Amino acid sequence: MADDARPRACLTCKRRRIKCDRAKPSCARCVLAVEYCEWSKPVARPKIRFVDSSQAVAARAKSSEKQITPKPPTTPKYALHDDLETQAIAFFVRNYILDSKPNGGPTPGLFGHVMPAVSSSRTSPAGMSISAVALTVFSKWRMDQSLTKRVPGVLGQAIKTLSHDLQKKDSRHSDLTLLTTLLLQYHSAVESLLFSKKSTIVHHLGALALVREFGNPSTWSAIASEFVGILIHLEVTKAIREQRTVHPEVRYWRSIIGATTVDPIRYLDDLGIQVADMQFRASALQERIGIGSSLEEVYLLLDDMHKLDECLVLWQGNVSRFWGPFNWTPPSIIFPPIQAFQGSCHVYTSINAARRLNDLRSYRLTLATTSLKLIREWGKSCPEFCESIPGHSSVHGIVSRIQWLVDGICASVPFCLGNRSRAGSLLDFNQASWTFPTCHDMSEMYGLYGRLAEPMGVESPSDHYSHALTQGSWLMLSNLALLVAMFLGSKAFIPALPVREGQLPWICQQYLRNLSLNAIEWTHDSLLVEKVLTGANLPPANVLISEASRCVRRVSRGLQLRDDP
């Protein structure tokens, strides 16, 4: 019980040390002494409810008759650390997102324009789509498959909310809605590759439908034009892979965007559209060999492909002194060693620049292999055809071009993969576990033709390390898959393709190594995986070639709708 807070005597009686009758407003002693009766202010009672001990005992006695079931532990509403979704988004922003203004470097693609989704509400479709992507890649680096169990719920809610938003006209015309569909499509491709799930085309088709709702391209915002540019690049690579022409509507979008920009990447997409056209024309001619086709048509097509290749060479010459490639030599002994074919290694100003130059090489390889197939097929039915081919389209010239392009892709592998010899984890970001070649290692840099380089868009060493770690092996998947499919695809065509001694086994080994670096399981033989990752005590060449041939079909399917970020 609490004590009585009333004072026992007035201050005057306390000072005189006499007994006080505690009468108010003035006690009897003060009245007799004609003194001012002063009282101390009462002490405020604490706002605490005191319970009599007998009541507490009685309460415990009554409850003891009942069986006590402990409550399960609960997560506090306001935890002292960030939840896993917040950690995943922070990791994604720090290590995946590229600068939207690369200071003279190539345009960054999808990962340079996702900040609006990151900044949006966590419960919006864009916010949930970025959460799904972030949780998926974070689970890969954290090596925690339990995180992926949260993704279907987030993904399903994003799609459900997006479907409601699409019923509103303003939402259909929103840049953020288009970004959401692009992120959902990218997530589908990631899951297809990393977790062997079926890739879907529905989000890609949805993005195309949204662009049609945008109206006249001349009224699009700058960010909308960037998103459409990503879609155009996807359509171009898809058309080349499927040996068809690009849809007329996509061509129209590209023509309008091209009239308002001088971006070299957008011009490269223009050239890619023409590459798809040439490939389609060649396929149609091959089907009509000896039936309603003439040598003049073949000569004209070969000449057109040669002129287009010259445009691609000119494009490379214009950007190479700014973005690379530049020859690189190691500044010191590196362990584990960087795996390079015959010691050849090229560096670029960024991982994104390496990606764009390999896009160019893939276009030129498509033209070269298409020309070579056309010459071989028509040479069988018309022996005098090969003798009358113009010099620039001769078999020897095309073979030399293919070899040079293959060498270029091989020389970009060390830049993207460095000396990595195991699948990545979060520890790789806390300490510089691996070494990646960079422009910072060189005092002087020269372009393809001996001209002094003028590098633009050079990433800092820390940014290059994180981007090479997270995106280098991912971007090399399509390039190495292209080479493996080209060399191991058509058995009748393989003998005509050039390859240096030991180059095909090296390409297959790097392809399998790249699968392991991305934590994509391709065999149950852990010893074989270790040999492929380290490059030491490798199995015979026929084993590497056989394993790569078996795996390339699955990866190629997973890459079908993927736009490299």
Question: For each predicted feature, which ranges?
Answer:
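Intrinsically disordered, low-complexity acidic/Ser/Thr-rich segments used as protein-protein interaction/activation
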Residues: 76-94, 98-313, 317, 321-355, ...
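Alpha-solenoid repeat junctions
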Residues: 38, 138, 188, 239, ...
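C-terminal effector modules of eukaryotic transcription factors
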Residues: 297-565
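Alpha-helical recognition domains of nuclear gene-regulatory proteins
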Residues: 12, 29-30, 161, 210, ...
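Short coil/turn segments at secondary-structure boundaries
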Residues: 42, 142-145, 378
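Short amphipathic alpha-helices and their capping/turn residues within compact interaction modules
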Residues: 18, 32-35, 42, 135, ...
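Charge-rich, intrinsically disordered regulatory segments
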Residues: 1-124, 151, 551
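Amphipathic alpha-helical interface elements that mediate macromolecular binding in regulatory proteins
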Residues: 8-11, 28, 156, 205, ...
